[in-house]
Amino acid sequence: MVYTDETDDTHEGVVLSNAVVTSRVIMGLERFKPDSTIFADEAVLRDGYRPDQLIERDNELKQYQSALKPVINGAPPKNLFLYGQTGVGKTLSSRMIIERLDEDQQNLDDVDVHFAELNCKSLNSSYQVAANLINEFREPEEQIKPTGYPSGMIYTMLFEELEKLDATHCLVVLDEIDAIGNDDDILYKLPRANDNGNVRDTSVGVIGISNDFTFRDNLSARVKDSLCDEEIHFPPYDANELGNILKQRASEAFHGTTASQLDNGAFELSSDILEDDVIPLCAAFAAQDSGSARQALKLLYKAGDMARDEESDCITEGHVRRADEAVERDKFREELGRLPTQSKLTLYGLLLLERESALPAKRNRIYERYVLAAKRIDADVRTDRTIHNRLSQLTLKGFLDVREQNKGPKGGSYYEYEFSIRADIVRDVLKGDSRLQELFDGIDGDMTLDKF
């Protein structure tokens, strides 16, 4: 409530000025005040921040730059495949190398390199990748719809756009290319666009980036021959490497904190608000789990956020341990949300058994409930063997626990499955999937989980 005139407000015989009325309306809310204790610049710990220097990736950067040297010499580019799990520096390395190449080509008269970068996370086919690449090259008013064209026409349009560039080279960066699954046609046609005569005047190179270690192995032989001229593996960071990354960022993120780089490349930290165990503990937690710098930074940021909320003067080991629990919950939610529908239906079957207090359960009981759920939403019903494989995958991802039961010669041995994470987290994520919404709508009391 905001007053703009000079009238008074009388309540129970008491005359209140406008200022008092305004204070009464917002009573209980704290004033917004700049953080002068914990964070100096919290953005450096959050997703989207771009550091000036990428540490602990010297070898990978050198290999990447070496692979692109033919371009600056006017030769055809190599096709590259970068792989490693999330948060190990693949995308950031690629952008740094591409920007350096773009900067250095400005000094050359006979080399003109065009760059196109596309994140394929939300794309699930070569057709969609090709259509989106066409729109990357076109002006907004000339862009096409992502569906409705014959496959051959889409590739013809893409090759025409490459011909129009009037450049000596075009490097196409396809990030998270594993999203297209087995439909890898684009990864054959684009790297071979010159050899097959589809593009004549511009040398085309493809840089594929994947978070999935198995994606490269599952590529067809012809794609491997075309795409993988050179492969660069980005391994997980170890605890020491993560510690250096955290120290570098902490010096910018927190008040009273400085870092200096020693001759051996390691960082030394001095801080008034970070207890000595904070950085090593964040690094150790992330290294043990995934080796992801993104996870380590998220953990340090969460610990700082908790300290700020508590109006603490420093960040402690206790903040880190509680932050680790919170980040772990968030990570499971994100990973659950990315699962394909068939995996979610499998988990739904376990939710039904959980509601019946029937976990752990054998595979055949889980499969029975999976079939009911799949039919309910008109999804394809997979075989028992396929669901067995999905149960194994869900176990490897940490969502399920499996135990072997041996009932002797008569009963035989079999496996039983149950949740390794809280069932309510699984339920919340599945309920938020529009495809599965009908399973939670309360239409059929035997199927729905409204009273879960």
Residue locations for each model-derived region?
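Walker A/P-loop nucleotide-binding motif
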Residues: P76-E99
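Short, hydrophobic-biased segments on the C-terminal half of alpha helices
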Residues: I98, L187, H388-S392
